[in-house]
């Protein structure tokens, strides 16, 4: 069954109509999005978080893969896929400064103050017993100096704790648990240089920077907290590989059981991240594949007079977002730009349930936000009160508002420049009620 959820878009973008430039205001998020995965038996609750720095894709891609492909059998895992969504979409460490240095004291006037309060509230939730925070760090940590790449000042491939023990707290044996995590990871190293080590920052001894971090805030509030660092020297798939190993190691240490639907190898992770079956549904009436899109899609329907953060996005993935950029709206998948949408602002009509289309001689019913596979040709059947525009097809004497129904359309009749994909195989069927946009159906020639 396809997993769907609504994504928050973290920019306010007010469209005043196609004839005017839209007003845009970009601001920090006010709260985090939490996805709770619950098992069937009582066991601890792990709070798993990634993406506090927007330019560390290993963390938020790991949480995304975890949410899509892991099942919790006993215990609970609460997942924040990305803490700093705006910075992620811009591929920036932190637009308003380092979000992971705002947990000790923060001026209430700081743009990210509400977001920090939301994260703090989640950390101190009585149901949470243990916390893991995912980062991508430089080089490879070593307790003693080995080289410029392997030394105590590096962070990559390490398990971070603030102190050895947290007395009187469940799972307070931080060093012991961290050693359990690193022992688990080190059983499955891709190369010896990737070896994991425990790094104790001894924060309470006066590390002023680490005192401002999320994990130390958790420690001060009697929560066992760990950070996992994957090296920035590694590919994205390798970073996610080590993050997932660390997550599995911690779950085993605290008694959370799980299954997953793939073999934990970098090649498998690469395929999951770059899955050609990933899709996005916008406004409940537009469907797009994530991969293979043209670099730009022009005259793309958007509801006018609607803030962009009120546009619903549904996907199997949890790290999608829309990013306004001048007169375009960029579709982002984590840090990756999937396409640039050139918006056409329209009134939206919600009345259309489906439309009949003859595909290769057989009539089928298609709902908005669906895709049909075509071998030879298709023909849209008339529907009272609606008109149809097939993007890339020109009807003779069609006028400015064509109604391209009752016409058999073969692949050769379509202008490939107007396909949505680079291969020239997928085309938009747009349905209108008067001037209002009612929905889009895609046809893919196979």
Report the location of each language-model feature.
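Structured catalytic-domain cores with a bias toward divalent-metal coordination
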Residues: 2, 16-446
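Sec-dependent N-terminal signal peptides
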Residues: 4-12
């Amino acid at each position: 069954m396809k997993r769907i959820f609504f994504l928050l878009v973290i920019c306010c973008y007010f469209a005043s109509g196609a004839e005017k430039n839209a007003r845009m205001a970009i601001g920090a998020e006010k709260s985090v999005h939490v996805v709770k995965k619950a098992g069937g038996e009582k066991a601890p609750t792990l709070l798993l978080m990634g993406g506090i720095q927007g330019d560390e894709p290993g963390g938020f891609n790991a949480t995304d893969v975890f949410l899509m492909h892991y099942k919790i059998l006993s215990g609970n895992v609460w997942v924040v896929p990305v803490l700093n969504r705006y910075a992620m979409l811009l591929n920036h460490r932190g637009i308003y400064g380092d979000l992971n240095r705002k947990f000790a004291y923060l001026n209430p006037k700081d743009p990210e103050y509400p977001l920090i309060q939301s994260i703090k509230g989640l950390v101190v939730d009585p149901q949470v017993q243990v916390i893991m925070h995912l980062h991508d760090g430089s080089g490879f940590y070593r307790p003693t100096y080995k080289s410029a790449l392997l030394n105590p000042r590096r962070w990559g491939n390490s398990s971070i704790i603030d102190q050895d023990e947290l007395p009187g707290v469940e799972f307070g044996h931080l060093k012991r648990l961290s050693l359990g995590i690193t022992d688990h990871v080190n059983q499955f190293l891709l190369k010896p240089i990737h070896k994991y080590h425990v790094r104790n920052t001894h924060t309470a001894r006066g590390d002023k920077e680490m005192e401002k971090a999320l994990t130390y805030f958790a420690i001060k509030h009697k929560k066992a907290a760990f950070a996992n660092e994957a090296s920035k020297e590694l590919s994205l798939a390798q970073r996610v590989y080590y993050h997932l190993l660390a997550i599995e190691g911690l779950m085993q240490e605290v008694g959370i059981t799980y299954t997953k639907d793939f073999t934990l190898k970098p090649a498998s992770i690469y395929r999951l991240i770059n899955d050609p079956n990933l899709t996005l549904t916008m406004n409940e009436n537009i469907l797009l594949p994530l991969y293979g899109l043209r670099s730009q899609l022009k005259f793309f329907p958007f509801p006018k007079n609607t803030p962009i953060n009120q546009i619903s996005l549904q996907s199997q993935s949890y790290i999608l977002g829309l990013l306004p950029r001048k007169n375009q709206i960029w579709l982002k998948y984590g840090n990756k730009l999937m396409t640039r949408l050139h918006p056409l602002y329209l009134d939206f009509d919600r009345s259309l349930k489906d439309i009949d289309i003859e595909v290769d001689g057989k009539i089928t019913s298609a709902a908005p936000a669906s895709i049909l596979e075509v071998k030879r040709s298709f023909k849209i059947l008339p529907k009272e009160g609606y008109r149809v525009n097939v993007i890339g097809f020109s009807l003779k004497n069609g006028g400015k508002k064509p109604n391209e129904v009752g016409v058999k359309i073969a692949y050769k009749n379509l202008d490939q420049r107007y396909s949505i994909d680079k291969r020239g195989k997928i085309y938009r069927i747009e349905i209108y009620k008067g001037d209002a946009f009612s929905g889009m159906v895609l046809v893919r020639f196979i």
